[in-house]
């Protein structure tokens, strides 16, 4: 087990004048990021261990403790890279627990830059685990913490490092696909939570994915009656043939009501699987706007988020009727700055 109590105690003892961002105490940012990441994990239902996620969130910005970065936050001098130095702290925790978790290390190393191929990442960490490099990393950790007067309570034991290195060399390609998915989930949760906390988001705001209360229009002609029957038959067949997550197709002629049928089938599948969101993807911007209008009619304007290359920032969930006072809301800034999907339905 990783020494979570010791880490939490150490973080709580950091002086408040050690910042993550101007005026924001680093310890508060790390705890805030961890809390948001866990809330996102629970919402999305990804198969990522809460312990690993919290651990990497609590150390992901420790490289900012360096005196040069603190001076930069106060407008003095240039900043220095902090993501890679932050991985050194996580490496000590992994070695303390005899764990091999390159995905967590890489999530921190890449949370402000590009991702690296798995083979290259494993080569990088194999080199870092060499005895000479361990001594160099120990000195760098001490240098990073120098002005804080807070010695790091964990070390880089060579025996544990050798075991970690051996595992990398012998098992590097094991279950590559599932580990890649795990890495992408860890990275996504970390980056999203980190940005949210930096922008001032302290808790998640979201609407539930609720069934539409808009009934089908009353048939006034024979075509309307056919559409109603087609809607009923498609929904029944789709529900009966559903075998879990996968690819399903719906083929209907123009004018059959595919948009409404598609949304209702997607909602039925979401209810069967416990999904919290619908993502309705379309190939052309013109029909994205058209289908988004249908979705807003079905679910309400606040429950639908439009996302495409020509979209202008229009307040909460891109609602044209949004109050201008919402422009300073941290979550609204997150939505417009990073195109974060927060609404129950994204088109």
Predicted ranges, named:
Residues 300-347:
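Inter-Walker segment of RecA-like/P-loop motor cores
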Residues 66, 115-121, 288-290, 314-324:
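Switch/connector loops and helix/strand junctions flanking conserved nucleotide-binding motifs
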Residues 2-216:
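Accessory nucleic-acid engagement/destabilization modules that flank
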Residues 85-89, 107, 265, 290-298:
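Alpha-helical scaffold elements adjacent to nucleotide-binding pockets in ATP/GTP-utilizing enzyme cores
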């Amino acid at each position: 087990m990783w020494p979570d109590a010791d880490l939490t105690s150490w973080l709580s003892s950091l002086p408040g004048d050690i910042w993550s961002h101007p005026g924001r105490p680093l310890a508060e940012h790390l705890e805030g990021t961890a809390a948001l990441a866990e809330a996102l994990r629970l919402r999305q239902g990804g198969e990522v261990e809460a312990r690993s996620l919290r651990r990497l969130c609590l150390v992901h910005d420790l490289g900012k403790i360096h005196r040069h970065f603190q001076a930069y936050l106060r407008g003095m001098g240039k900043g220095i890279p902090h993501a890679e130095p932050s991985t050194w702290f996580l490496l000590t925790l992994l070695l303390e627990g005899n764990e091999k978790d390159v995905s967590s290390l890489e999530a921190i190393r890449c949370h402000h830059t590009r991702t690296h191929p798995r083979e290259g990442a494993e080569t990088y960490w194999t080199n870092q685990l060499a005895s000479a490099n361990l001594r160099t990393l120990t000195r760098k950790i001490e240098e990073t913490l120098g002005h804080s007067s807070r010695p790091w309570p964990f070390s880089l034991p060579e025996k544990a490092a050798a075991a970690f290195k051996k595992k990398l060399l012998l098992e590097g390609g094991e279950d590559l696909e599932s580990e890649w998915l795990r890495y992408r989930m860890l990275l996504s949760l970390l980056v999203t939570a980190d940005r949210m906390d930096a922008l001032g988001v302290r808790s998640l705001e979201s609407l539930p994915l609720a069934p539409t209360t808009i009934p089908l229009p009353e048939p006034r002609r024979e075509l309307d009656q056919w559409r109603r029957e087609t809607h009923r038959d498609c929904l029944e067949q789709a529900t009966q043939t559903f075998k879990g997550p996968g690819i399903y197709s719906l083929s209907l002629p123009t004018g059959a009501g595919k948009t409404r049928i598609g949304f209702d089938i997607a909602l039925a599948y979401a209810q069967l699987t416990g999904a919290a969101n619908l993502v309705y993807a379309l190939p052309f911007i013109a029909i994205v706007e058209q289908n988004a209008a249908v979705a807003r009619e079905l679910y309400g304007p606040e429950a639908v988020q439009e996302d495409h290359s020509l979209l202008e920032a229009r307040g909460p969930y891109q609602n044209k009727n949004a109050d201008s006072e919402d422009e300073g809301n941290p979550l609204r800034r997150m939505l417009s700055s990073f195109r974060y999907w927060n609404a129950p339905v994204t088109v």
